[in-house]
Amino acid sequence: MKKTSINTGTPDVKVDEAALVTPFVKCLARLVRAQDTYGSQDRASDAELLAHFIITEEQRREIPIIGDPGPDVMLRFNIFYTAVALSIEARTGLVASPITMISHEGFGRVLLTTGRLVVFSKTVRDIHRFGFATLRKLAEAGAKLVDDATAAIETYPEVARA
């Protein structure tokens, strides 16, 4: 039987304090809180809010190989890349815009643009399996995307500001 949080009914996540204090994870937690328009998760910790982004190996094995993404998965996917864009903006001072084009089958493309510069482009598939093994892996993935995008902006600043 899976342990769940008393506050939110979400699966318990091994709390990684170092991951929770990273700028990217703080931004992601703010965005998740912003989606809670009724305040039903006001008392939840950041780790509890981010538990939906964590998919253990056991949980991943239970997810079918082929499947359509549900609205909750699509929301998590969009929030993740929006957090990347906001973190880029916080670091560089330039507005970064996420563009996601996902089919109903969970295949598509993610772009992040700043000015006329495409700072991130990725073809995605199996969105219904979107998630990370731990909070640390979530933080590392987000930070890497932000670092790579920032490096692209520093390499081509005139295009990013156009």
Swiss-Prot record:
Keywords: Nitrogen fixation, Plasmid
Gene3D superfamilies: Protein of unknown function DUF269
InterPro entries listed in its UniProt record: NifX-assoc_nitrogen_fix (IPR004952)
Any one Gene Ontology BP term: nitrogen fixation
Family per similarity comment: Belongs to the UPF0460 family.
NCBIfam families in the record: NifX-associated nitrogen fixation protein
Listed name of the protein: UPF0460 protein y4vQ
Lineage: Bacteria, Pseudomonadati, Pseudomonadota, Alphaproteobacteria, Hyphomicrobiales
